[in-house]
Swiss-Prot record:
Keyword flag Membrane: yes
GO cellular component, one term: plasma membrane
Descriptive protein name: Aliphatic sulfonates import ATP-binding protein SsuB
EC number of this enzyme: 7.6.2.14
Cited SUPFAM superfamilies: P-loop containing nucleoside triphosphate hydrolases (SSF52540)
Chain spans, region Disordered: 308-335
Length: 335
């Protein structure tokens, strides 16, 4: 993992780790020991907090981001990944526009999370090239969130967000907790929070670094339906305000269509389907256009062929094939 990548997660923290940490004498900067644990277990180096700037102007900014504004943040060229004799990804070509929101769907084991880990530089390609360009052509500061928040249980909510930043970052941490609606819980312990609240803290911990690329590996998979919808709205609002590039891996087709400018399907280690989502934000999930687009993506996942003509205002990219589709009848999951 490079110095510009933050896995917004902790590796397994055993009881021995906890006992050893509690037995350590407190030092001038009490966070230093925990930052070392964080780095050891797949954490990251802290970067200075930078102002997110003014939010973009409404839907016009979303259109520019969906098109990538001609500026790729991430580009993969003929990327393959093998584990021994098993090929997981094969000759993947992908360009992700700066400031866009891309979702990846597919059946279990198709290579979705492997692709995300390659982009995060937690894995290296077996073949091909991966190029990440930050603002001005520099390094692309990246954060990644997983399904488990993995907060340090002996740290308060505020201290978890501040981890690795030092005590002077307290104001920044409080500001981002306010953004995710948890400032009032800043001094609570992680055990006092619900699952959705813990994921909000994990999101705050990633956003306090003001990343240019946020990778989301099924971060909402363990939450109930209503909490997921609330988190969708929160992630979308923060994405529009902070203008980072987002790449989401999910089994939930409705979630993919609700959040993304573009939905990719991975089959047999390749990108088999690339569907633009030209729907206005916030997405009206009860609309015919949304339902038809969700159905089209789901049918493509389930049947391996592009289903019926897309709904009005939900056309796919040029060259996408079209056919008939049966209603998805409430099916949302591509497992």
């Amino acid at each position: 993992m490079t110095g510009t990548t933050l896995a917004a997660t902790y590796g397994p923290i055993s009881g021995a780790d906890l006992e050893a940490e509690l037995a350590q004498p407190r030092i001038a900067d009490g966070d230093a020991q925990d930052a070392a644990v964080y780095e050891r277990d797949g954490g990251a180096r802290a970067l200075p907090f930078a102002s997110g700037g003014a939010p973009p102007d409404g839907d016009r900014a979303d259109v520019r981001r969906a098109a990538g504004a001609g500026d790729a943040s991430v580009r993969l060229t003929r990327v393959s990944k093998r584990y021994g004799e098993r090929a997981v990804l094969a000759d993947v070509d992908l360009s992700i526009g700066r400031g866009s929101f891309v979702s990846i769907v597919g059946r279990s084991g198709c290579g979705k999370s492997t692709l995300l880990r390659l982009v995060a530089e937690l894995e290296t390609p077996s073949a091909g090239t991966l190029v990440k360009r930050g603002d001005g052509g520099g390094a692309l500061d990246t954060r990644i969130m997983y399904q488990e928040a993995r907060l340090l249980p002996w740290k308060t909510v505020l201290q978890n967000v501040m981890l690795g930043l030092g005590r002077r970052a307290k104001d920044d941490a409080r500001a981002v907790l306010d953004e995710v609606g948890l400032l009032a819980r800043a001094n609570d312990w992680p055990a006092q929070l619900s699952g959705g609240q813990r994921q909000r803290v994990a999101l705050a911990r990633a956003l306090v670094h003001r990343p240019q690329l946020l990778l989301l590996d099924e971060p909402l998979g363990a939450l109930d339906a209503l909490t997921r919808i609330e988190m969708h709205a929160l992630i979308e609002r923060l994405w529009r305000e902070h203008r980072f590039t987002a790449l989401l891996v999910t089994h939930d087709v409705q979630e993919a269509v609700a959040l993304a400018d573009r939905v990719l399907l991975i089959e047999a280690g390749r990108i088999a389907f690339d569907q633009r989502v030209p729907l206005d934000r916030p997405r009206a999930r009860a609309s015919a256009a949304f339902a038809a687009l969700e159905d089209r993506v789901l049918q493509r996942v389930l049947t391996g062929s592009d289903a019926a003509p897309a709904a009005p205002n939900a056309a796919g990219p040029e060259g996408a094939s079209r056919g008939r589709a049966a209603p998805a009848s409430g099916l949302r999951w591509a497992v």
